[in-house]
Amino acid sequence: GYGMAEGLMEAGCEVVIVGTSDKVYDVAKGFCDRGFKCHGVKADFSKREQVYQGFNDCVAALGGDLDIIVNAHGIQRRHSAEVFPIEEWDEVLNVNLNSVFILCQEAAKIMLKKGYGKIINIASMVSWFGGQTVPAYTAAKGGVTQLTKELSNDWIARGVNVNAIAPGYMATEMNSALLDPENPRYQQITERIPANRW
């Protein structure tokens, strides 16, 4: 998310970043200190009312308009499928899929009126090959992939592009448990990456 926000600002966009803690304000200030136009909004996308409020706060920060939305947020919970807690399943699906639909829907209400907009959803390679000990994440990202296709079919003729990017493993905080080179899973993942690195 950080890199995508930075890239959009480097291209001249005014950007709103969303985070679950007050750290989002420090990150936004850091971008502003570098000469970018950036705003921070705090919201917990596991809570439906905060998804709507967070979206409204973002649009307000941008003066009431929206051209591009990137749904790059997500969480991860790791358990074998047979013992995966249903509460964590619900949390992951709420953040990684349900909030994506709500944000796409709310963005489209603005974009369709003006006949222009770009919606970019972050899916995952697990949408195709599955994962290990991440059934909720895999289900959610598979849902994002299919949802993106459906929304694209619905809105492209009216000027709103909807696409998904499905990156492989990235060295992020969410994957910190896998980043230890001594971890056998790290080796399995790295061996199937052509560049042999994350």
Residue ranges of model-derived segments:
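Residue(s) in the substrate-gating loop at a strand-loop-helix junction
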Residues: S124
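Conserved glycine-rich Rossmann-like NAD(P)H-binding loop of the short-chain dehydrogenase/reductase
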Residues: C13-D26
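Active-site helix of classical SDR
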Residues: C104, A140, T148
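Conserved NAD(P)H cofactor-binding loop of Rossmann-fold oxidoreductase domains
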Residues: A72-R77
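Canonical Rossmann dinucleotide-binding motif of NAD(H)/NADP(H)-dependent dehydrogenases/reductases
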Residues: G1-V16
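Substrate-binding pocket helix/loop in short-chain dehydrogenase/reductase
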Residues: V51, S80-A81, P85-L93, R185, ...
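Alpha-helical segment proximal to the catalytic Tyr-Lys
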Residues: K109, N153-A157
